[in-house]
UniProtKB/Swiss-Prot annotation:
Signal peptide: none
Protein name: Putative hydro-lyase YcsI
InterPro entries, sorted: D-Glu_cyclase (IPR009906), Putative_hydro-lyase (IPR038021), UPF0317 (IPR016938)
UniProt source species: Bacillus subtilis (strain 168)
Keyword Lyase: yes
Encoding gene per record: ycsI
Record has Glycoprotein as a keyword: no
Taxonomic lineage: Bacteria, Bacillati, Bacillota, Bacilli, Bacillales
Family statement: Belongs to the D-glutamate cyclase family.
Length: 257
């Protein structure tokens, strides 16, 4: 299904779950919305932390239109689910942020690793959360991000189990896509990056890990949500983890090789 058709169904409330596997071949995006007076600090944070926060588009202040990524989209309605954070506390989860929108809001679209999953599949590497019909597993880590202005915190990662013999290939395939997190930041022992139990993700759902597989971890665009909990601004709006915007950007247009 074309991205604009998926967005229309989301806008109508007919799609309200995770978007992994939808509109294969098109990039998906995370969302961060905050007030204009914090926008420069956040843009600087993204520039200093490009693995977890690769910027695909930034809206004009007050505009809900991502003019580069999807010119006919509306970031207030075209994600299946949103999270509202007030002073660092998650207060609401909604399907439409139009009632919350303010004239000085700036929206950031952050590249999402769902965008390189089709490339993994094309290379014979199954994506477990798609096969199991669940959300991707995401975890807080002990990896510090580079601070910028008010923004500081630890990186969040997504995890996909990969057969050990294909782990290097998974790294090669995804390294072609730096605009959507690129290659993995860690392979193997989760404890080395501060993850205690793969069966208890901080965001998303747990997936099965089979004999002969290793966990492979990629930087994740949910990182700004963890950072928002530290910064505690008056209001930050994000997507709900796994519930992305389908953009009009072709995955392959983001590849470097």
């Amino acid at each position: 299904m074309a991205p604009k058709d998926v967005r229309a169904l989301i806008r109508e409330g007919k799609i309200n779950g995770p978007t992994a596997g939808m509109s294969g071949g098109y990039a998906q995006a995370n969302l961060v919305v905050l007030k204009k007076d914090l926008a420069f600090d956040f843009l600087l944070f993204c520039q200093r932390n490009q693995k977890p926060c690769p910027v695909l588009d930034v809206t004009e202040a007050g505009s809900p239109v991502p003019s580069l990524a999807a010119p006919d989209a509306d970031i207030r309605t075209d994600f299946p689910k949103y999270r509202i954070y007030r002073h660092g506390i998650l207060t609401e989860e909604v399907s439409d942020i139009t009632p919350y929108w303010e004239d000085d809001f700036v929206g950031f679209l952050i590249g999402c690793s769902f965008s390189f999953e089709q490339a993994l599949i094309n290379n014979g590497i199954a994506v477990r959360h798609i096969d199991e019909g669940t959300n991707v597993s995401m975890y807080k880590t002990n990896i510090d991000c580079v601070p910028a202005g008010a923004f500081h915190g630890q990186m969040v990662v997504s995890m996909r189990p990969v057969p050990e013999r294909l782990a290097v290939r998974a790294a090669q395939v995804t390294s072609r896509f730096p605009a959507v997190h690129g290659g993995p930041i860690h392979i193997g022992n989760p404890g080395a990056i501060g993850i205690r139990d793969l069966g208890k993700p901080d965001f998303g759902d747990a997936v099965s890990i089979r004999d002969g597989e290793v966990p492979v971890f990629w930087a994740c665009g949910v990182t700004p949500q963890a950072v928002a909990m530290n910064v505690k601004p008056e209001m930050v709006i994000t997507h709900a983890p796994g519930h992305m915007l389908i953009t009009d950007i072709r995955d392959e247009s983001l590849a470097v090789l």
